[in-house]
């Protein structure tokens, strides 16, 4: 990877650098994600079918492990003649913004799409940063053209982008995530947008020139970003990253995570009707997908954080079949069930928290996710949904969080990893609790006796040891920092320790409560 970065300036200086690529290689995927070994991270997939070949255009994440930023210098290409064969061709360094668009800055190669035009050529719609622009947000959408999906590519509109905050009409949104449909009648439509702002517009039949007018799109509940338009049986479908969050949301409990939602329309520019969720949140906070029919089957491509060394800014593309329910009208997208390559057997551990169900006294604020408590991960630079917390502006004085097991367990220790953004004693933000304790259920809630002490230092595990107790429910009870108002409590990970290591059991259905809470 470092070698590729070092070569990039040399490649950019070569004549015809728009077609300079790192050598392709054949990859045999073991399952999802397609590239799983951590050498290359692929993101924001956009599928394309041409003849007997399925292509997937992807971005490339190159952030260091603890960097929370989208470091994306180039696009890559995956291709296969049969997804079931798991044989893929991978081309890194496929396109760089500055090598195709003279008006673009390097880096920020965000989600684009390649579409075959009526003239048989291929059009690449790319969001890039426009240099020398005084727009408040310099993201703009350019169009490149090639005779083949593999390039070489040249700017189809060398004078600059076709969409920005200044043209074809002024807007104040971030102009990224383009998706394009060539309709059966030869008319062309483009959608784009993020941060809850979706726009749509007709293009001229040259695939390049805006025809307009630009239209603000409503009706797609929870739209956040990443639109993907397709047509099936005279119905227009829109996939998109939705983040209508809440404890009872069909999409996501945490606002930082997104689902793949979908809606339908009977005309290419709407009106649109929300229909449901096609893919629940995956391991990455962002959700970006595309869907296409290939050799009689429909596939959804999306990204996750499941590759070796992966994360929210080191994502990797996956592919699964997408099926339809034609018994209803309009036909419904059945929820896609994500698959993953076989994983190594878990190693024995004393920590049995992963097999418990977690509940808390408070309605978990949408920036947090209670599932993070026992996901087995501690991060140096966590995002809010990678922890459980109580902060909501009106924080409880004595909150608790509880693990429930389906059957009684014997435990003799616990470790908790506190998060804080305020010092101890503070009554604002998230601060270490003034005190906390463990209680277990034995016909009633009882304090765990003989504990070794309850530390409250954030940013490291605080361990508590005690004589073994057997129970089905264990809880942490906190005295929040402050004297009113109170600070929130934040926990990144809570482990519960059995006396001896054992292979951890997988979490099943939610375990029932112990008595009355």
Please state what every model-predicted region is.
Residues 1-4:
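Positively charged n-region of N-terminal signal peptides that target proteins for export
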Residues 382-449, 458-517:
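Aromatic, loop-rich ligand-recognition surfaces of beta-strand-rich domains
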